[in-house]
Structure formats: structure tokens, C-alpha cells
Amino acid sequence: MIADAFLWILNRTPSLRRALWRALFDLLAMRFRHIGWWTLMNYGYAEPGQADTSFDLQEADEPERYPIALYRHVAMLAPMTGRDVLEVGSGRGGGASYIARYIKPRRMVGLDLSGKAVAFSSKRHGMANLHFQQGDAEQLPFADESFDSVINVESSFCYPSIDRFFAEVRRVLRPGGHLHYTDLRLAHEVEAWRQAIARSGLELIAERDITPNVVEALHRDSPRRREGGRRIAGAWAGLADVFTGVDGTRIPSLLAGGGMAYYSFLLRKPPVSAPVSAPVSAYAAG
């Protein structure tokens, strides 16, 4: 009920959305700053019918295989190796760390609205090609055409204006650069989401409904999520179950029942700058 009330407030007061999410993630980062094993908060990705070991991970990364798999799925939509990459909404830094260590961009920057999350990430993930800083997804603190790739994982639903986010991504991408993008929406919000993508001035290169993959990941990962919630939340473990998407709670039920959908997209800034109203070319990727 508490989680539902929080989401109800967010949906009806977009002007408060940024402040409420920042307060929540500041609280999480401060309360759990000593818990180094929890570095990713997304719902994960798994291929139904495939073994959990379908790609290699270092032993230390294995517990977060499913959230890492979501980053891997989105990151592999276009090359990142040797490129300048920005993650908008880097959270506790685990996704940016995975990309920096496994995919090896020239430069990896993780940006998050929560200063406390940035402090945690900077302390937890130390690498020469990885840097974290605080900033707003709708006012990216970077010069025009600073990055070859931008990645955004399960974060944009928090933003007051998705249009401003897309405009900022378009601004900081170099011509021909990619936005690797994945998120979820309630079923009745999907059409408006598609319209926002269509008017972004970014070309839609690939799109995939990964709802079954996220449902599968949440099912497989529920024992870890449930156990982690009891370790860190104690008497509030039930609320932690809702927040982390344990089987039987609201988000997995909506996803499995068709009330919510989860998509991944690859978008591209036109190789030669074009007006925002330029037509969008698209094809579906299976």
C-alpha cells in the first residue's frame, strides 16, 4: 500500500517527481552505503529456456547476474568498445562498472541525480576509465557532441519531462551516436511513450518487447531479492519485496498480466544534424 501510494503521488504531481525520487535515492544510498554487494537496482533480464550461464562473469559479479544481463542486452545493441559512453541514471554504479570492465569503452561516465549515490559509486567502483558525477537528466552538464553513446536503464520513468531528456541526449551525442535505452511503462502509457520517441529527432533503429525476459529474470532472481530485503530492511522487508520486484508483488504481476510493458530501444542521432521534426525511420528487431 505504501509503494502504491508513492507511485500514485508521482503520477499525479510531475512537478514533485524529481525531488521525490532524489530524496528516495539519497535515502537508499545513505542508509545502505556500507552494503557493497548491492550495486544494481533494475529488474533484470533472462532468456526463457536458456541456462543462467549463457555469458561469462567474474565470480564477484555472479550474484547480480540478472541485473547485469539487462545492461549487457542493451549495451550490445551497438558498439561501445573504445568509445566515450555516458550513463544517465547510474544509481549505485554497478551497470557503469560492468560496461567499463567488460565492454571497455575509452571513457565511461555515470551521471545520477542523487549526490549520495554518486559518492557511493565513486567509492565502490574505482577504475581509470570510469567516473561518476551528479547531474540532472534534463540538464546534462556536458558540452554539445561529447559522447559516442548514451545508455539509460530503467530510469526515465522518474523524469518529469521525457521530451527534455531526449533533447539533452540528442545534444550531447555526436552525429551518428547511439542511445541505448530500456524502461517500463503502464500499458496505457506506451502509445504516448512511442510518440515521445518519434518526435525526439533520434532515429529508431531497433525496438524489442522484452517483457517476457524481465518477468523471467524476476522469477529466477526472487530468492536473492527476498533474502537481500530481509538482510537490509528487517521489519520493512515486505516493502523491500515490492520495491525490488519479488514474485507476487505489484510490478511482476502487472508485467505478467499485460498491465505493464518493458521495452528496449536503440536510437541514433542522425549522422548529419537534422531538425527535431525530421522523420523517424524504424524497424522492429526480434
Question: Which sequence ranges carry the predicted segments?
Answer:
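Class I SAM-dependent methyltransferase SAM/SAH-binding core
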Residues: 86, 92-139
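N-terminal auxiliary segments of SAM/dcSAM-dependent transferases
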Residues: 1-40
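Conserved beta-strand signature within the Rossmann-like core of class I S-adenosyl-L-methionine
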Residues: 177-183
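Conserved Class I S-adenosyl-L-methionine
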Residues: 212-272, 280-286
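A short glycine-rich, Lys/Arg-flanked "PGG" loop and its adjoining helix->strand segment in the class I
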Residues: 163-175
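Conserved alpha-helix/loop element of class I SAM-dependent methyltransferases that forms part
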Residues: 64-81
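A short acidic, Gly/Pro-enriched loop at the edge of an enzyme's catalytic core
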Residues: 138-150
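A short SAM/SAH-binding and catalytic strip from SAM-dependent methyltransferases
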Residues: 149-160
